[in-house]
Amino acid sequence: MTDLFSSPDHTLDAQGLRCPEPVMMVRKTVRNMQTGETLLIIADDPATTRDIPGFCTFMEHELMAKETDSLPYRYLLRKKH
């Protein structure tokens, strides 16, 4: 089985940051990405378990994978547009 988290196009380490900073950084990073590129987000704020999926839904990006069973949390999104 392939680890989706192993080769993202971009990585954002948001560890130590608290809401709303992680999502603000994700938005800024995604804005500078090309359509179809992937972003690995590494975070430890419990609010990201709600905020990152919500961001993807609201902005219509694909949340390809998430690991939130233990810290740090990892999310992989694909820019859709």
From Swiss-Prot:
It is found in: Cytoplasm. GO terms for molecular function: sulfur carrier activity. It comes from the Bacteria. The active site is at residue 19. GO terms for cellular component: cytoplasm. SUPFAM superfamilies: SirA-like (SSF64307). Its main location: cytoplasm. Keywords: Cytoplasm, tRNA processing. Interacts with IscS. HAMAP family: Thiourid_synth_A. NCBIfam families: PRK00299.1. This is Sulfur carrier protein TusA. The lineage of its organism: Bacteria, Pseudomonadati, Pseudomonadota, Gammaproteobacteria, Enterobacterales. The gene is tusA.
